[in-house]
Amino acid sequence: MMLIQVFSFQVSARERKLHVVTTGDVHGSWFDRAYVEGQGLRTSLMSVKAYVDSLREAVGKENVLLLDAGDCLQGDNAAYYYNYVDTSVPHLFPRVMAYMGYDAVIVGNHDIETGHDVYDRVNA
């Protein structure tokens, strides 16, 4: 299950509106395909990117903060592939986060469960 929350609040002194968008429990749903024949599109980080891009365009990039609450490294074929199959290339997860423009990403319990080898590659 993917969680998306949007908060808006006012900052005093010079009035400014900051939009905070958070994701969490993505569990490897980086792309909108489930890799199973006959299944349609699903909610993914690419869906979130489309929303965040439109929000950044509407209110200004500097007024949007994008955060992830962890649990991104397990649960999908793409995550499994980069965790355990193709371990000779840079892990895809940091590149996905950079592509989306995340401001901060924290580690969840399922991210640690992948093991030290995976965790070290993600942090390299």
Regions found by a protein language model. Name each.
Residues 12-124:
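N-terminal catalytic scaffold of extracellular/periplasmic and nuclease hydrolases
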Residues 2-3, 37:
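Generic low-polarity alpha-helical segments
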Residues 1-2, 50:
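Accessible peptide chain termini
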Residues 3-11:
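C-terminal segment of classical bacterial N-terminal signal peptides
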